[in-house]
């Protein structure tokens, strides 16, 4: 089942999507459905998808969790060595709520950045409270999946000279994940039963029509199940939490090609829909 949050007549609503028609189920986003309310009820109205504005499936998720370096190809393109997953743990971080946005929302390059980059990712949405679950049972806690783009600022221009020593470079990387609208998700939330195995999905991203990233989720180092299980050991996962599961190779940093005013990104993961993000703003000089 494909579910959407949308705006019609100035009101946020949610519903089922099929063949370009939305069967409206009620007001608000999909949070109640994700938490256990039925999505099988009778429609209160119908809308043509083209006549409404599709929003992020969840407008205020409790947590936006992300993993770094979860595809060997992405590690290799950045100059890293092959990894043995038995000897490492997932590298998790959190994005602020202000990073989250939906399809068609503009990403404005902040003045502090000279190098805004793209990262298409599969996003898993938690549907049940999970604490200390095993990888074998972890997928039963996932409500569904959507497309995401972990837009990242590779360089920060602080406006003064700095010594890049110690852990400064790490914190620059971390803070480069915080920009407003740098975590678009959508357009559809596809229920887990329809996806089946999340490790079989094509994952792609285009910039201005040029294919930049093209791989499959089978190439993840840590599977979705392993990531959910690991995160549930760190903290309690609750319905509506979203987990961005890492990006494949093909990011702009590899060639020094970054986003500019007027660019358009299109991210797509299997049946989760094409997530369009227009880019505005002019980058400032880097340190």
Model-assigned labels for residue ranges:
Residues 1-91, 204, 264-268, 283-287:
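N-terminal non-catalytic cap/leader segment that marks the start of a structured domain
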Residues 6, 15-18, 94, 103, ...:
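Short beta-strand-to-turn element immediately C-terminal to the catalytic PLP-Schiff-base lysine
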Residues 20, 97-98, 127-131, 151, ...:
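Short loop segments at secondary-structure junctions
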Residues 44-47, 53, 57, 74, ...:
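Catalytic-pocket segment enriched in acidic/His residues
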Residues 54-56, 80-83, 107-116, 130-137, ...:
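A generic local secondary-structure boundary/capping motif
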Residues 86-104:
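A gly/proline- and charged-residue-enriched helix-loop-helix capping module
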Residues 102-154:
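Non-heme Fe(II) oxygenase catalytic core, chiefly the N-lobe of the double-stranded beta-helix
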């Amino acid at each position: 089942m494909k579910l959407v949050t949308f705006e019609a007549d100035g009101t946020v609503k949610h519903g089922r999507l099929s063949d370009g028609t939305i069967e409206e189920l009620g007001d608000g986003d999909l949070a109640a459905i994700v938490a256990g309310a039925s999505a099988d009820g009778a429609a209160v109205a119908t809308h043509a998808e083209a006549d409404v504005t599709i929003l992020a499936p969840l407008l205020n998720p409790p947590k936006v969790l992300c993993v770094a370096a979860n595809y060997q190809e992405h590690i290799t393109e950045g100059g890293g060595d092959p990894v043995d997953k038995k000897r490492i743990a997932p590298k998790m971080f959190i994005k602020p709520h202000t990073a989250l946005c939906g399809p068609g929302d503009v990403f404005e390059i902040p003045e502090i950045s000279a190098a805004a980059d793209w990262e298409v990712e599969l996003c898993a949405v938690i549907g049940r409270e999970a604490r200390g679950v095993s990888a074998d049972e972890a997928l039963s806690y996932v409500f569904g999946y959507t497309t995401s783009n972990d837009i990242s600022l590779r360089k920060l221009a602080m406006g003064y000279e700095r010594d890049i020593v110690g852990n400064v470079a790490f914190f620059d990387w971390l803070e480069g994940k915080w920009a407003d609208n740098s975590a678009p998700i959508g357009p559809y939330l596809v229920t887990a039963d329809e996806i089946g195995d999340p490790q079989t999905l094509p994952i792609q991203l285009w910039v201005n029509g040029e294919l930049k990233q093209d791989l499959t989720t089978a190439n993840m180092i840590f599977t979705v199940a392993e990531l959910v299980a690991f995160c549930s050991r760190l903290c309690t996962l609750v319905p509506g939490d979203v987990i961005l599961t890492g990006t494949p190779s093909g990011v702009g940093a590899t060639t020094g090609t970054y986003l500019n005013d007027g660019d358009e990104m299109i991210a797509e993961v299997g049946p989760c829909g094409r997530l369009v993000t227009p880019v505005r703003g002019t980058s400032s000089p880097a340190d």
